[in-house]
C-alpha cells in the first residue's frame, strides 16, 4: 500500500519567486513541488502538496492527514508565530511532523523567533531554502522505512 505524505504551505508561499527573493529565493512553489514529487516517487510515496493563505483550511488538511498520511511536512509561514489552532491540530497527529522554513527565522525579526509548532515537531529545518523540504522528505522516508 502506498504511503501518503502531506506537504502543507502557509500564507504568502504562493508568491515564492517574486516576493522578497533576497530572503526566500527565486524558486517558485511549483518548482519546490516538482522537486518534492520526484523525490516522493523515488521513495514510493504519494504526495499531497497544498498551499493556503487561510488558517482554517490548513487545520482541515492537517485533520485529513491524521487518518490518511504517514507524515506531515509543514511550512506554516507567518502562522508559525501566531497559530495555536495549527499547533493543536498537529499535536493530535500520531506521525512524524517536520517544520520547514526557507529562511533562518532566528536570524530575522524578534517576532519570528517563537514557533508554536516547534515544540510538537519531530524536527525543524530553517535557513536551507528549498533544500529544507528535501531534507525533511529524506528523514521522513528513513523514519517510516520507505
Swiss-Prot record:
GO terms for biological process: amino acid biosynthetic process; aromatic amino acid family biosynthetic process; chorismate biosynthetic process; quinate catabolic process. It is an enzyme of class 4 (lyase). Pathway: Metabolic intermediate biosynthesis; chorismate biosynthesis; chorismate from D-erythrose 4-phosphate and phosphoenolpyruvate: step 3/7. Substrate binds at residues 75, 81, 88, 102-103, 112. The keyword Cytoplasm does not apply. It catalyses: 3-dehydroquinate = 3-dehydroshikimate + H2O. The active site is at 24 (proton acceptor), 101 (proton donor). InterPro entries: DHquinase_II (IPR001874), DHquinase_II_CS (IPR018509), DHquinase_II_sf (IPR036441). Signal peptide: none annotated. Keywords: Amino-acid biosynthesis, Aromatic amino acid biosynthesis, Lyase. The record marks 19 as: Transition state stabilizer. Its EC number is 4.2.1.10. One of its GO terms (molecular function) is 3-dehydroquinate dehydratase activity. Homododecamer. Belongs to the type-II 3-dehydroquinase family. NCBIfam families: aroQ, PRK05395.1-1, PRK05395.1-2, PRK05395.1-3, PRK05395.1-4. Catalyzes a trans-dehydration via an enolate intermediate. This is 3-dehydroquinate dehydratase. The gene is aroQ.
